[in-house]
Curated annotation (Swiss-Prot):
<keyword id="KW-0645">Protease</keyword>
<keyword id="KW-0963">Cytoplasm</keyword>
<dbReference type="GO" id="GO:0006508">
    <property type="term" value="P:proteolysis"/>
</dbReference>
<feature type="active site">
    <location>
        <position position="165"/>
    </location>
</feature>
<dbReference type="GO" id="GO:0005829">
    <property type="term" value="C:cytosol"/>
</dbReference>
<feature type="active site">
    <location>
        <position position="78"/>
    </location>
</feature>
<keyword id="KW-0378">Hydrolase</keyword>
<keyword id="KW-0788">Thiol protease</keyword>
<comment type="similarity">
    <text>Belongs to the peptidase C15 family.</text>
</comment>
<dbReference type="InterPro" id="IPR016125">
    <property type="entry name" value="Peptidase_C15-like"/>
</dbReference>
<dbReference type="Pfam" id="PF01470">
    <property type="entry name" value="Peptidase_C15"/>
</dbReference>
<dbReference type="InterPro" id="IPR036440">
    <property type="entry name" value="Peptidase_C15-like_sf"/>
</dbReference>
<comment type="function">
    <text>Removes 5-oxoproline from various penultimate amino acid residues except L-proline.</text>
</comment>
<dbReference type="InterPro" id="IPR033694">
    <property type="entry name" value="PGPEP1_Cys_AS"/>
</dbReference>
<dbReference type="InterPro" id="IPR033693">
    <property type="entry name" value="PGPEP1_Glu_AS"/>
</dbReference>
<protein>
    <recommendedName>
        <fullName>Pyrrolidone-carboxylate peptidase</fullName>
        <ecNumber>3.4.19.3</ecNumber>
    </recommendedName>
</protein>
<dbReference type="GO" id="GO:0016920">
    <property type="term" value="F:pyroglutamyl-peptidase activity"/>
</dbReference>
Length: 215
């Protein structure tokens, strides 16, 4: 099994991005799966262009995109990506699309095809906080998740794809009182646990367990 992992460069005034720092620490093989990690720019469309190049060349069985969600308290596999860019802040090249479809020929939304509930369970078993998230936002994270599912559907129809948000690293919240954070080793360990679940559930349906929210 081949798994493509992506991590964004720093954005929004941050000097580091835990997504990129964590994937740099991943081993080349996890649970028998070949792991390829790539950096993507926090830029609308350009991030998808980089991803497309690697999907076409690597032909992965699964794509897991990782992104920073400052303020979240645990690792959060995303359930759905919507066909809409609505940027609260500019991306790293100054683009700030508002109410703009990501793909004119795409679906209104794509659901993750990764085993998100099994991923949460595996992260819990590793002793770390995790939950299913029902919104990936409307910035570049949602953009890339949507594009990943669109591209996999087009170029690797038998592959699975999805996205997982992770918290700030400890050093990012030194000047952010009462903001949740996690140390880098634990973030990396959580990502590895999620990858274990992706491999384990390659040929079977996701777990049936509560993962919803009331609001």
């Amino acid at each position: 099994m081949k798994i493509l992992i992506t991590g964004f460069d720093p954005f929004g005034g941050e000097a580091i991005n835990p997504a990129l720092e964590a994937i740099k620490k991943l081993p080349a093989t996890i649970h028998g799966a070949e792991i390829k990690c790539i950096e993507v720019p926090t830029v609308f469309q350009k991030s998808a262009d980089v991803l497309q190049q690697h999907i076409e060349s690597f032909q992965p069985d699964a794509v897991l995109c990782i992104g920073q969600a400052g303020g979240r308290t645990g690792l959060t596999p995303e359930r759905v990506a919507i066909n809409q860019d609505d940027a609260r802040i500019p991306d790293n090249e100054g683009n700030q699309p508002i109410d703009t479809p990501i793909r004119a020929d795409g679906k209104a939304a794509y659901f993750s095809t990764l085993p998100i509930k099994a991923m949460v369970a595996a992260i819990h078993q590793a002793g770390l906080p995790a939950s299913v998230s029902n919104t990936a936002g409307t910035f570049v994270c949602n953009h890339l998740m949507y594009q990943a599912l669109y591209l996999v559907d087009k170029y690797c129809p038998n592959a699975k794809a999805g996205f997982m948000h992770i918290p700030f690293m400890m050093e990012q919240v030194v000047d952010k009182p009462n903001t949740a954070a996690m140390n880098l080793d634990d973030i990396t360990r959580g990502i590895e646990a999620a990858i274990f679940a992706i491999v384990d559930f390659k040929d079977r349906s996701d777990l049936k367990r509560v993962g919803g929210a009331t609001h």
